């Protein structure tokens, strides 16, 4: 099967849908992979790493010509025009965007929205939401610490003592638990209402 990994075109998107490690596994199973030139640059993965894993580096039209297309976010209208009828697109496709889903259906494209995969032990390898929420919880506390005008941990100096920052974390899901752990590691006093 020919698998395409295009460059993500959404503003601010720095992720890539496949890593050299996953590409190596797919190639060992007999698949042919085309990665769009520069697809991994924003994720700190150069084209040479994909080539070393066995992928072919190509243009957008070649990556979108795959029978299976791996995307991080849903394709835009320009990208949809490059996808062949009968192709399969896998990624975080926003299954509640009826307009986009309708356009894919009209073009004969099969779509698998990973964010709609059940969050069960059996489907755990498809769970993209937990990993993204984990990163979001971590980053939220780092951003809060950056914007906080004082310090996160308690500091005792010759000039006096600075109390630890008080952090309120709303929610105790995957993101909330990671936020609690990060705030604690930074030395803040934290609270999460139950």
Labelled PLM ranges:
Residues 57-65, 104, 135-147, 172-187:
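Short, Lys/Arg-enriched charge-dense amphipathic segments
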Residues 28-32, 55-56, 71, 106-110, ...:
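Generic secondary-structure signature for well-ordered alpha-helical cores
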Residues 2-103, 107:
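An N-terminal-biased, well-structured beta-alpha scaffold segment characteristic
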Residues 2, 8, 78-166:
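Glycine/serine-rich phosphate-binding loop and adjoining beta1-alpha1 elements at the start
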Residues 6-45, 151-194:
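Glycine-rich phosphate/diphosphate-binding loop of Rossmann-like nucleotide-binding domains
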